[in-house]
């Protein structure tokens, strides 16, 4: 860092430079958004001033009329966006403007693919905000003063976006922020009142602050329009959510979504409702068309804004919606909460609990409408919703007991019914196809669809034509631990506990199984002795029709798949041993009944194969290979 007089020269972090280059390249085809982003920042600054002004009216400095001004200068080739919002101190400029790189920046950059359309969406989700100015400007000058600080505490930030920026302390009479864009050579088309007004009305008409521009008047002498001193408001400057629904176009709904969500695509669906009665509030809630890159970061909750009587209060969505709906964007505006409400009061507020419950009801209702609609457009939207947010919605089964049945009804899975990759099977679909004598909903969990489809546990179910749900999302182990039944039918893992097919198994089969258990009792006891602490026990199975053996967890033990998931997350896994179940009709098992010399090797190979078949890892792969090679060599030498 160099210091010369009052000017500091500082460098961007390397990742920030890279992100700036990527952003300018990826977003250039949608360059108009620079104005939307800068107006959004100005609007946020006004919201913050209103909020802080509730407890300290002196911050208004005798200038309570909040507005945003847009101006341009053809000769200087500049566009200026200014506001009289909260402004920034020197440290806030460094924190908010001087530091573009935030946690996750490196991982975010690595996720970019070179596909311009996809990368533009990802960059929008990451939040470019102020830095979108560099799409059209080769130099940006920001001058600001925080409300409450004296005029000599102004700060000027300047950068060409190439790797460094300068900071200096300046005199600034008015509070707020002014951003001057020095346009690139090929951006002169933006130096037009008509063009700027068009962009403002397209992207920022819903901003509740007036956006002011000077009028242009015709000058007879020069035969051209000239900028006058008279000002006018360009946007509607009214809260879109407070207007009647029939006065709002779909395009206006979409543009407001892009403003609150910092997205470039229209949303998938929205719900706009005015709630009256004990509680009075307005909801305008959106479901995005794609998941944000940080969807699985449960700590990041800034999608939903709370307003009280049109005054922004907070965007801590945890108080307003449960974690499993963290993808929802939009606003809630209450007429009942006191304006000076604190976050602590909100945490304990029954009014907030009521608003939260009402919002959950609306969002689930919106998803249900898509799921049950006869319209192909809505059906396609639900498919997109499930693909993007289905795993997160599954969290609700554990988190939201009061809505568990509604959430369960929305869940979608793959199954052995058609075995397609897309998750389209609902629990109601499964129940409708159950055999008349079937009492349970059968499922299997695995770490991937292929692993689930090829599981040996499915063999008896395929033979009998019984459908099994194939659960292969990481969240599914948590889901099934919290969803024990649905519509009066219990859910049963086919890889845990004793196999109980109930009325699906006839008396002849039961008698045959009992006889086989007796016939193989000596063999199973001998195998248990050889395998020792690797297994809880060895027993005859009725699950298998083709494979020689499989592993089964005890009823109340953790499944092998869950144990592997926890281990991969670095968590401690409680000790539990599986049952080894062997197929009495398989040639390998029948041979083992009469094997003496290589009995231990055959027993270990059956166990290791069963472990591999369920996706497990061998503790000693070298011993497995040695045993297998010995047995193969023995067969070759014996001519078998």
Swiss-Prot record:
Matches recorded under Pfam families: HATPase_c_3 (PF13589), HSP90 (PF00183)
Region annotated B, chain positions: 344-564
Subcellular location: Cytoplasm
InterPro entries, alphabetized: HATPase_C_sf, Heat_shock_protein_90_CS, HSP90_C, Hsp90_fam, Hsp90_N, Ribosomal_Su5_D2-typ_SF
NCBIfam families with a match to the protein in the record: PRK05218.1
Function field: Molecular chaperone. Has ATPase activity.
Protein name: Chaperone protein HtpG
Natural source organism: Nitrosomonas eutropha (strain DSM 101675 / C91 / Nm57)
Taxonomic lineage: Bacteria, Pseudomonadati, Pseudomonadota, Betaproteobacteria, Nitrosomonadales
């Amino acid at each position: 860092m160099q210091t010369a007089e009052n000017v500091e020269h500082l460098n961007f972090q390397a990742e920030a430079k890279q992100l700036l280059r990527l952003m300018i390249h990826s977003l250039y085809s949608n360059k108009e958004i620079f104005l939307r982003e800068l107006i959004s920042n100005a609007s946020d600054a006004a919201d913050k001033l209103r909020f802080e002004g509730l407890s300290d009216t002196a911050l208004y400095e005798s200038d309570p009329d909040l507005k945003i001004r847009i101006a341009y200068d053809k000769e200087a080739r500049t566009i200026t966006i200014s506001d009289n919002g909260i402004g920034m101190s020197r440290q806030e400029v460094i924190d908010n403007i001087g530091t573009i790189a935030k946690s996750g920046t490196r991982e975010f950059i690595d996720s970019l693919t070179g596909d311009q359309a996809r990368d533009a969406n990802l960059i929008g989700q990451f939040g470019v905000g102020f830095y979108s100015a560099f799409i059209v400007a080769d130099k940006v000058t920001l001058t600001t003063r925080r409300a409450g600080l004296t005029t000599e505490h102004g700060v000027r930030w300047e950068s060409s976006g190439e790797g460094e920026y300068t900071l200096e302390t300046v005199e600034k009479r008015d509070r707020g922020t002014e951003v001057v864009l020095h346009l690139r050579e090929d951006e002169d088309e933006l130096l037009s009142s008509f063009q700027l007004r068009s962009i403002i009305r397209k992207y920022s008409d819903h901003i509740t602050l007036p956006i002011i521009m000077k009028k242009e008047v015709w000058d007879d002498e020069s035969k051209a329009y000239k900028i006058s001193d008279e000002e006018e408001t360009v946007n509607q400057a009214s809260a879109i959510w407070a207007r009647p629904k029939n006065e709002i176009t779909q395009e206006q709904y979409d543009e407001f979504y892009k403003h609150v969500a910092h997205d470039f695509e229209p949303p998938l669906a929205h719900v706009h409702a005015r709630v009256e009665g004990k509680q009075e509030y307005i909801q305008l809630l959106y479901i995005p068309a794609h998941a944000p890159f940080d969807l699985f970061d449960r700590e990041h909750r800034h999608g939903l804004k709370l307003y009280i009587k049109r005054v922004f209060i907070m965007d801590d969505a945890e108080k307003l919606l449960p974690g499993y709906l963290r993808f929802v964007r939009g606003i809630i505006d209450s007429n009942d909460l006191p304006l000076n409400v604190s976050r602590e009061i909100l945490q304990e507020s029954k009014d907030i609990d009521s608003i939260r419950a009402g919002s959950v009801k609306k969002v689930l209702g919106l998803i249900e409408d898509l799921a049950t609609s006869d319209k192909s457009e809505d059906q396609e939207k639900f498919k997109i919703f499930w693909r993007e947010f289905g795993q997160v919605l599954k969290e609700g089964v554990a988190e939201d007991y009061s809505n568990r049945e509604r959430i369960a009804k929305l869940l979608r899975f793959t199954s052995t019914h058609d075995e397609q990759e897309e998750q389209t099977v609902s629990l109601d679909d499964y129940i409708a196809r159950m055999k008349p004598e079937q009492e349970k909903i059968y499922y299997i969990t695995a770490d991937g669809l292929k692993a689930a489809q090829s599981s040996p546990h499915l063999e008896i179910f395929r033979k009998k034509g019984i459908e099994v749900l194939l659960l292969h999302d990481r969240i599914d182990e948590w889901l099934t631990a919290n969803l024990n039944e649905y519509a009066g039918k219990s859910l049963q893992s086919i890889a845990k506990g004793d196999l109980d097919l109930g009325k699906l198994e006839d008396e002849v089969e039961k008698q045959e199984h009992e006889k086989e258990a007796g016939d193989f009792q000596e063999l199973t006891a001998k195998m248990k002795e050889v395998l020792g602490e690797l297994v809880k026990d060895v027993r005859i199975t009725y699950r298998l029709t083709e494979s020689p053996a499989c592993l089964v967890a005890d009823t109340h033990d953790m499944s092998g798949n869950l144990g592997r998931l926890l281990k991969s997350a670095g968590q401690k896994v409680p000790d539990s041993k599986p049952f080894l179940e062997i197929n009495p009709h398989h040639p390998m098992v029948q041979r083992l009944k009469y094997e003496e010399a290589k009995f231990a090797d055959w027993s270990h190979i059956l166990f290791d194969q069963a472990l591999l078949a369920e996706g497990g890892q061998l503790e000693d792969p070298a011993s497995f290979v040695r045993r297998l090679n010995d047995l193969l060599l023995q067969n070759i030498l014996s001519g078998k």
